């Protein structure tokens, strides 16, 4: 009889060693003296309020606690960020799923579609066509045209979420609680210096003049990469006002979904997938990014989506996967060249992993799409 093989304990040992070293560092450097206890109290109070708001849905609608928490956080977002920004962002997200599903179907269509929209509109910024009616009609037309693909993607996302919650309800609840706490930064008005001095310029110009003045004499950063600000501009024009909070909440959702999928592609069970989401949401930098318009929040969504694409086919590849990866890589370059540099090892990893099934004929088209999205 063949000998039974046991998984190596080294990966788990490395993971738990990192946690142990973190605890040792906290004690050795007396980090509790630097902890912002008033902020921790505020977060604890918000968590209790969210659980209380979710309780009626659990009690009378028999929703899972994680799903009820998600609904409570979304309702709070609509209250504090405004219903119009949330509706505008939802319309943009639906249109992104519609166009992204032309490349790959399923929830992955959302980050791909956002990359396609940003890459396309980036070439049209100087034209006076960025009116609210134009954006609304374009999004509604895409939603009407691709409604079946959009509904399929939403069903797939819900089934994945529901299955994950049923498999590990406690971990799912913890992850949704932390993700919701991170999203509270999206309730705040835009007030970080970089955002007020630069990032708000593009969305505000699109809303006020229907075009973007790419003139470095007016703003020294006017010709800097702008993919993230373009999507902020679409949401702001559709909403008729600032929509940063709702758009950042969308990026948090995309990042959480990508991290959940990536952890699964790496072999994690349901609990570890939710742990990956919780880890991402609990990083202090995540909340800081959700309060502003920095490119790192967008990269936090697109990079794990690209990594998931590399892993998804278990050693095989397809032309559509190559095109999807090219779109995401180009979008990262158009976000900030640094993010493209960070993604380069993933491209090398993808080439090695899929070397036996690499669709060479799709590579020139992929390179062209990456140049369009990142140019």
Q: Where are the model-predicted features located?
A:
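Membrane-embedded, hydrophobic transmembrane alpha-helices
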Residues: 1-162
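Transmembrane-helix signature of polytopic, membrane-embedded enzymes
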Residues: 65, 69, 106-112, 242-243, ...
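Membrane-interface transmembrane helices that cradle and orient dolichyl/undecaprenyl
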Residues: 104, 306-322, 350
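Membrane-interface alpha helices of multi-pass inner-membrane proteins
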Residues: 120-125, 310, 321-337, 346-347, ...
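Transmembrane-embedded, aromatic-rich helix segments that form part
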Residues: 134-138, 323-324, 337-352
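Perimembrane helix-loop-helix junctions
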Residues: 163, 342-371
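Short hydrophobic alpha-helices at membrane interfaces in multi-pass membrane enzymes
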Residues: 276, 312-330, 360-364
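Short acidic/glycine- and proline-prone juxtamembrane loop motifs at membrane-interface regions
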Residues: 288-298
């Amino acid at each position: 009889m063949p000998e039974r093989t046991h998984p190596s304990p080294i990966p788990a040992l490395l993971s738990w060693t990192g946690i142990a070293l973190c605890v040792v560092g906290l004690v050795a450097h007396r980090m509790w003296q630097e902890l912002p206890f008033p902020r921790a109290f505020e977060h604890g109070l918000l968590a209790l309020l969210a659980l209380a708001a979710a309780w009626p849905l659990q009690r009378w609608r028999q929703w899972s606690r994680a799903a009820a928490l998600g609904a409570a956080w979304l309702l709070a977002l609509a209250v504090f960020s405004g219903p119009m920004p949330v509706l505008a962002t939802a319309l943009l997200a639906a249109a992104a799923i519609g166009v992204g599903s032309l490349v790959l179907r399923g929830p992955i269509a959302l980050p791909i579609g956002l990359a396609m929209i940003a890459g396309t509109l980036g070439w049209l910024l100087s034209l006076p066509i960025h009116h609210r009616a134009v954006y609304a009609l374009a999004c509604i037309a895409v939603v009407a045209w691709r409604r079946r693909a959009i509904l399929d993607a939403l069903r797939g996302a819900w089934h994945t979420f529901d299955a994950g919650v049923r498999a590990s309800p406690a971990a799912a609840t913890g992850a949704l609680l932390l993700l919701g706490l991170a999203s509270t930064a999206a309730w705040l008005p835009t007030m970080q210096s970089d955002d007020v001095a630069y990032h708000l310029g593009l969305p505000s110009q699109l809303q006020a003049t229907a075009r973007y003045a790419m003139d470095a004499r007016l703003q020294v950063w006017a010709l800097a990469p702008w993919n993230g600000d373009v999507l902020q501009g679409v949401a702001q024009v559709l909403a008729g006002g600032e929509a940063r909070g709702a758009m950042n909440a969308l990026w948090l959702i995309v990042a959480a979904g990508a991290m959940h999928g990536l952890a699964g592609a790496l072999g994690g069970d349901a609990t570890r997938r939710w742990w990956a989401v919780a880890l991402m949401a609990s990083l202090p930098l995540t909340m800081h990014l959700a309060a502003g318009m920095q490119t790192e929040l967008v990269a936090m969504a697109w990079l794990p989506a690209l990594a998931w694409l590399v892993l998804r086919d278990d050693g095989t590849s397809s032309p559509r996967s190559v095109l999807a990866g090219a779109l995401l890589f180009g979008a990262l370059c158009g976000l900030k060249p640094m993010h493209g540099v960070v993604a380069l090892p993933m491209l090398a990893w993808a080439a090695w992993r899929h070397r036996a099934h690499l669709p060479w004929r799709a590579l020139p088209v992929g390179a062209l799409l990456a140049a369009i999205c990142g140019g």
